[in-house]
């Protein structure tokens, strides 16, 4: 907060002192550097900021701008510390399948350069295991297919702390021991995933020409999204995979670009769903086990109401560029590298060379 006395008074007034609130006052160091702002409120800072005079900005964005600049103005070395950790952020961005647009592109690009410096022993260990330690440039594709899956396996089996401890340590013995654990967890993940896949036919509870729904109460919830993705790809349908933990059912939707997954869940009455979230391509939700039968009925109804995109066989392929015949392979690769990193919502270019 900024200006603790005033802000705490407002918080106590709002919550009627019903809860204990601990705050950190970021104004103290700022005022030492800029004494003219003593006794100033956040409103005063917003009014004094010229940036807001030339564009319409929502109040939440104004507050973010103020707090961001106050923190970095009084902690000049903080940004450098953050930059040294962007290798982790880059891996996390890809591993969590975040859209590679806007700020994410900048963070990922800088993070990949940080990885290429080979300064993190744990990350180097991952690169070595993937046979890319000596590769000059590490790409988003390298992370997506060779690094992210093995790290993600720990979270899928609810043992993410092992991956965190592995990444953060600089002790070579701990790195070796933790990585051995991670490899074992990944093998277990593969086994459980294959077991769930092999039994999906008997666990299919609803299927038509557009949708398939499976319920397997023995599959770990962290694997449900993987099975949903495989189902969607294999059947070329919208896939929904359900699993159970402690009387709570967790569902994963993969749309195969046929529907808006988030819209599908929104059609189902809210009293049947505990939590839900996602985007067009994928969504997740939870519900109580005793409501499963009602949920399936409503889900079947929702599949008839959600807008479904059919594939047009004559649909044209969007071409990003037409290549000249005299373009060398090295020039082509260099051009493609310029637009790195690629990933979700920022695909590799589709190129055309005529009359080859």
Q: Which positions does each model-derived feature cover?
A:
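Short, surface-exposed amphipathic charged segments that create phosphate/polyanion-binding patches used
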Residues: 35-45, 229, 332-334
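Hydrophobic helix-and-loop "lid/oligomerization" segment in the mid-to-C-terminal part
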Residues: 75-297, 308, 318, 322-325
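A residue-level signal for conserved active-site and pocket-lining positions in enzyme catalytic cores
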Residues: 63, 152, 336
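A short acidic, amphipathic alpha-helical/loop segment
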Residues: 10-14, 212, 227-230, 331, ...
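A contiguous loop/helix-start segment that scaffolds small-molecule binding in enzyme catalytic cores
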Residues: 97, 305-356
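Acidic, Mg2+-coordinating catalytic module of metal-dependent nucleases/exonucleases
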Residues: 4, 10-11, 42-82, 91, ...
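Conserved DEDDh/DEDDy metal-dependent 3′-5′ exonuclease domain
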Residues: 1-35, 56, 60-67
């Amino acid at each position: 907060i900024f200006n603790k006395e005033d802000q705490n008074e407002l918080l106590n007034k709002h919550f009627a002192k019903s809860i204990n609130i601990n705050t950190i006052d970021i104004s103290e160091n700022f005022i030492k550097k800029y004494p003219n702002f003593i006794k100033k409120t956040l409103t005063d800072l917003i009014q004094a900021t010229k940036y807001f005079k030339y564009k319409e900005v929502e109040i939440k964005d104004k507050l973010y701008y103020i707090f961001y600049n106050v923190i970095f103005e009084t902690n000049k070395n903080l940004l450098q510390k953050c930059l040294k950790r962007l290798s982790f952020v880059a891996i996390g961005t890809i591993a969590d399948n975040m859209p590679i647009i806007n700020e994410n592109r900048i963070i990922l690009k800088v993070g990949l350069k940080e990885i290429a410096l080979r300064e993190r022993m744990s990350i180097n260990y991952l690169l070595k295991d993937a046979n890319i330690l000596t590769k000059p440039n590490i790409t988003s594709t390298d992370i997506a297919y060779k690094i992210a899956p093995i790290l993600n396996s720990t979270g899928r089996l609810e043992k993410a702390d092992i991956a965190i401890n592995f990444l953060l340590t600089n002790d070579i013995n701990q790195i070796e021991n933790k990585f051995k654990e991670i490899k074992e967890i990944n093998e277990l993940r593969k086994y459980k995933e294959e077991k769930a896949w092999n039994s999906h036919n008997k666990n299919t509870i609803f299927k038509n020409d557009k949708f398939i729904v499976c319920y397997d109460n023995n599959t770990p919830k962290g694997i449900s999204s993987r099975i949903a993705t495989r189902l969607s790809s294999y059947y070329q349908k919208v896939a929904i995979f359900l699993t159970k933990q402690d009387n709570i059912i967790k569902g994963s939707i993969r749309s195969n670009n046929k529907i808006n997954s988030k819209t599908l869940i929104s059609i189902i009455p809210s009293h049947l769903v505990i939590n839900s979230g996602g985007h067009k391509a994928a969504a997740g939700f939870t519900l109580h086990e005793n409501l499963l039968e009602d949920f399936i009925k409503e889900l079947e109804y929702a599949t008839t109401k959600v807008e479904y995109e059919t594939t047009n066989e004559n649909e044209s392929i969007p071409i990003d560029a037409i290549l000249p015949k005299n373009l060398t392979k090295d020039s082509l690769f260099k051009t493609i590298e310029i637009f790195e990193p690629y990933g979700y919502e920022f695909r590799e270019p589709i190129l055309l060379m005529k009359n080859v």
